[in-house]
Amino acid sequence: MGRNWFQVTAMAVVPVVGIMAAVNPTILSSAASSLPSLGAMFTSDDFASQMDGRIQAQGLLSSHFGMYGWPGQSFDYVIVGGGTAGLAMARRLSQDGTASVAVIEAGGFYETDAGNATEVPMYLFNYFFDNGKVKNPLFDWYQYTTPQPGLAQREMFYMQGKTLGGSTARGAMLYHRGSKGAYDMWADHVGDDSYRWDKWLPYFQKSVHFSGPETNPRPANATALNDNTAFTASGGPVHVGYPFQVNAISSWVDRALAKMGFPEAQGFSNGNLLGRSYITHTINPYTRRRETASSSYLREALMESNNLNIFTRTLVKRVLFDDQNRATGVTVNTDGFEWQIGARKEVILSAGVMRSPQLLMVSGIGPKDHLEQLGIPVRSDLSGVGQNMQDTIILGPTVPVKVESHSQLMGNKETLPRAIREYNEQRKGLLTNPGQDYFAFEKHQPGMLKESTAADIDAAFPDDWPTFSYIALDDTFVPQYDGKNYFSMSAALMTPFSRGTVTINSNDTANPPIVDPQWLADPRDQEMAVAAFRRCREIVASDVMREVVAGPEILPGPQYQTDEEILNYIAETSDAYYAGVGTCAMGKADDPKAVVDSKARVLGVKGLRIVDASIFPFAIDGQPMGTVYALAEKIAAEMMAGQ
């Protein structure tokens, strides 16, 4: 099969809009009608072309797609969910050729379902939020939360990829690793030293191929430092590097934070987060396109294995068990037809933080009282299923700036056509950068929080665990269609105390689970949110930033000064971090809330594992994608070793 199988030759989506965009259909229509089409997704560079193949296969490509609806099919391993962890597991379990593997994915191929929104880095925001006007249910579950008291009773859209690649095809492409202390705390929590930082590192290295800042030229004032010991030369399937274009505002933020005493970090992948740095992304530095679990792990598996079978557009209804409580397969539904797929060795759930616990519960694994209320026979009474959900929010003020930013893409009649031409012809310009390329992490400083709150954080988290992350967001929190340049100094809470839940009110996985993250439910989180917002304002008001800020704060505006006013603004405008974890938490055998053991095996049954972010015992500081890839590598290696 030729490498152009999924080549997109015309602009498939409307241009990106500002973060949290409430799309103005009139503006979009008039803008789109005058744009040059987004051309073929390949550069003229020969090496880049070699690095760019998408769907190729060993033998017939069609041999890797399962026979839908045929009875009696069984495989050694059945993986539910072709996302971040699922495709990494599929690649490793099928790699030596001795085991047959089936991947069951509810969605399809994002290249055909979402076009360039999943390929061009800056186009990620096209479907990043749901405002009722622009929507694509082909590659997202369109999950909504219950009304959130901490967020002005809003029912929040919660992005969850429903596609091969999962949320790696939907998210912000940010790649980093947690702090050393976070992984050591994981090891202590589950009673397994294989989760300490030094034991994690080989799996981090095995999952990614790092291309340093020297791969593409960078401005002299945008130096990116890296600890090269965090990566290996051989690396793994997932390309990690820096966006080709550096956001102009980021060098100003770098200078401002340096003057404020933030130390320079070495890339956020060596286990040390505290400090400031340009951040790496899962972007192929040669093609300047999004890299996903599908374009990396799945591509490798198809090219090098002949024992992998993929079932797309197929929803898993429940896990099947024999009378010894061993998982023997799954019941699935493909376009209304219900049938079964058998598992000779194990079933592996990689359906994510919301749908892995849902699948457990409809299969009889979960809180006994809740399952009995729904008439579901109880197979394993695990009270922790669906509990312990942890996530954070992103917040911050917006100001006009004197340098070009991504906010110009909407409303400026010259900027977007120019950006498309630059991307088409040279793979450069605004579209190569998703809009957030500079981060900082900080512990709470004296006086930022109440003494009691600071003491609680110090008692609950390791010394190297940051309290806040700061993001130089090259856009606005609320869209401005005037074509001007705006910048949002943003923050996220790294030590939230609020805990949410995922529950069900139906025994049918076609019905969405009930998701209640409980953002800002804990008063300490509210206090941290206000402190983070004030810190963002402090950065923007610094001497360095005054030179580039073009006017007064536009959002929320200088009239918001008291803690109550700021908290109300945060409640009304902040958004999900889309980094939920913990709903099938890993723990020790005597932990009443544990769902899986340290080998990811579901307690109380046999032949069933979960490998995804739902088994994190707690939220790692920052984005979880890098840790999910490494977790899949770790569990797969242990399974292949007979554990």
Curated annotation (Swiss-Prot):
Q: Where does FAD bind?
A: T84, A85, E105, A106, G171, A172, M173, L174, A613, P624, M625
Modification after translation is described as: N-glycosylated.
EC top class, as a word: lyase
> Per the UniProt annotation, how does pH influence activity?
Optimum pH is 5.5.
Report which reactions are catalysed by this protein. (2S-3S)-versiconal hemiacetal = versicolorin B + H2O; (S)-5'-oxoaverantin + H(+) = (1'S,5'S)-averufin + H2O
| Annotated GO biological process | aflatoxin biosynthetic process
- Under Enzyme Commission nomenclature, its number is 4.2.1.143, 4.2.1.142
Tell me which residues are glycosylated: N116, N221, N507
Give the matching SUPFAM superfamilies: FAD-linked reductases, C-terminal domain (SSF54373), FAD/NAD(P)-binding domain (SSF51905)
User: Where's it mainly located?
Assistant: cytoplasm
The pathway it acts in is:
Mycotoxin biosynthesis; aflatoxin biosynthesis
Q: Which UniProt keywords apply?
A: Cytoplasm, FAD, Flavoprotein, Glycoprotein, Lyase
Instruction: Offer one Pfam family short name for this entry.
Output: GMC_oxred_N
Q: Which domain of life is it from?
A: Eukaryota
Q: Which cofactor does it need?
A: FAD
> Which residues does the propeptide include?
1-41
Provide the protein's localization: Cytoplasm, Cytosol
| Any single GO CC term annotated in Swiss-Prot or TrEMBL for this entry | cytosol
GO MF: cyclase activity; flavin adenine dinucleotide binding; hydro-lyase activity; oxidoreductase activity, acting on CH-OH group of donors; protein homodimerization activity; versicolorin B synthase activity
Sum up the protein's function in the record's words.
Dual cyclase; part of the gene cluster that mediates the biosynthesis of aflatoxins, a group of polyketide-derived furanocoumarins, and part of the most toxic and carcinogenic compounds among the known mycotoxins. The four major aflatoxins produced by A.parasiticus are aflatoxin B1 (AFB1), aflatoxin B2 (AFB2), aflatoxin G1 (AFG1) and aflatoxin G2 (AFG2).
Q: How does it assemble?
A: Homodimer.
Family per UniProt? Answer: Belongs to the GMC oxidoreductase family.
PANTHER family, per this entry?
A: DEHYDROGENASE PKFF-RELATED, GLUCOSE-METHANOL-CHOLINE GMC OXIDOREDUCTASE
Name of the protein described by the UniProt record:
Versicolorin B synthase
Organism name:
Aspergillus parasiticus (strain ATCC 56775 / NRRL 5862 / SRRC 143 / SU-1)
| Source taxonomy | Eukaryota, Fungi, Dikarya, Ascomycota, Pezizomycotina
What's the gene? aflK
